[in-house]
Amino acid sequence: MSTINLPLNLTVRVHPVVLFQIVDAYERRNADSERVIGTLLGSVEKGIVEVTNCFCVPHKEHADQVEAELGYASDLYDLNRRVNPSENIVGWWATGQEVTNHSSVIHEYYARECNNPIHLTLDTSLTAARMGIKAYVCVSLGVPGGKTGCMFTPINVEVTSYEPEVVGLSLCAKTIGVQSNPARPRTVSPMLDLAQVSEASGKLQTLLGEVLNYVEDVLAEKQQPDNFVGRALLDLIHSVPNMKHEEFAKMFNSNVKDLLMVVTLSQLIKTQLQLNEKLTSLTSFLS
């Protein structure tokens, strides 16, 4: 067993796309497969393991051994490196609630692929009220000159996301309750641009109202001031450009014109593609 010296104060940050990929792999598993495993891709920096991608590795588990298609895993990783050279192997994942007897064997392989791999488990069986996410590191155990082994020790794990992922998650959240309410549509289409601007403006107005209420309560000594909140508000004010109303209106109108130009060009391209498709079909029919 490979010796792994890893601090236990690590934090694993998993992006939503990784969780979706794991669930998708679990839904597509073979009928005789009890669980699914795969490779975690991402980066490690200053005690933070950020998992941004993953892929499934076909395998079979027997009573005394594990058979995994390691050649497939290596080829898929090489292909991913061509597209995302910044993503490296940081560990492996498995569906299920707990670590199994075969986990140490699989972890030994990933210990040869990267330094200090992590192990992520996702409870796709939904035994609890929520889909449980756990992360582990393998700590070597034993006495000098005697038998050695390893133990999977839990570490902190949290879900993080980029701004585009937040938009996608917000859209997915609107479909919650579709299964329990058959009258609701099963799909939700993205809103129009102006509708998104209107919704974002409404949320911004609500947040500004909460900030104003907080500031007024602090000034009226109804609430204790918070230095952290004060510094955050000061940074927010300094980040807003100081410009006149006419300059802002000119800049806004310029951006709107650019947006309308992009929309017009997109519609022209769409029309051209549709016309080309019809002409191609007509030519094939005449010939």
UniProtKB/Swiss-Prot annotation:
GO terms for molecular function: metallopeptidase activity; translation initiation factor activity; translation initiation factor binding. Keywords: Cytoplasm, Initiation factor, Protein biosynthesis. InterPro entries: eIF3f, EIF3F/CSN6-like_C, JAMM/MPN+_dom, MPN. Coiled coil: none annotated. GO terms for cellular component: eukaryotic 43S preinitiation complex; eukaryotic 48S preinitiation complex; eukaryotic translation initiation factor 3 complex, eIF3m. CDD domains: MPN_eIF3f. GO terms for biological process: formation of cytoplasmic translation initiation complex. It is found in: Cytoplasm. Residues 12-142 form the MPN domain. Component of the eukaryotic translation initiation factor 3 (eIF-3) complex, which is involved in protein synthesis of a specialized repertoire of mRNAs and, together with other initiation factors, stimulates binding of mRNA and methionyl-tRNAi to the 40S ribosome. The eIF-3 complex specifically targets and initiates translation of a subset of mRNAs involved in cell proliferation. Belongs to the eIF-3 subunit F family. Component of the eukaryotic translation initiation factor 3 (eIF-3) complex. This is Eukaryotic translation initiation factor 3 subunit F. It comes from Culex quinquefasciatus (Southern house mosquito).
